Amino acid sequence: MSGTVAAPEGITDPPIDELLTAADSKYALVIYAAKRARQINAYYAQLNEGLLEYVGPLVETRNQEKPLSIAMREINKGLLTVEATESTED
């Protein structure tokens, strides 16, 4: 039955090793992707209201693809940049 199982998607596509080139660590990558996934989710939520406050997906999306998978593909293609913020010490 070769060819009947769809190729795995999600964290295996794109590979984690490729994604780690865009961030300093696995933890930074998780935060980076989660923030972008929240923006994509908010974009879809506001479409019904006619507001366009957030930027939608920057890559072609598949049917019922999760925002986190979309965010990871955007990161892998180099469509997003990370800017370090300075932490303020009290």
UniProtKB/Swiss-Prot annotation:
Q: Does the keyword Transferase apply?
A: yes
Asked if the record carries the keyword Transferase, the reply is yes
Reaction it catalyzes: RNA(n) + a ribonucleoside 5'-triphosphate = RNA(n+1) + diphosphate
Sorted alphabetically, which SMART domains does this protein's record hold?
A: RNA_pol_Rpb6 (SM01409)
Q: Which domain of life is it from?
A: Bacteria
- Function text: Promotes RNA polymerase assembly. Latches the N- and C-terminal regions of the beta' subunit thereby facilitating its interaction with the beta and alpha subunits.
Q: How does it assemble?
A: The RNAP catalytic core consists of 2 alpha, 1 beta, 1 beta' and 1 omega subunit. When a sigma factor is associated with the core the holoenzyme is formed, which can initiate transcription.
Q: What is this protein's name?
A: DNA-directed RNA polymerase subunit omega
The UniProt gene name for this protein comes to: rpoZ
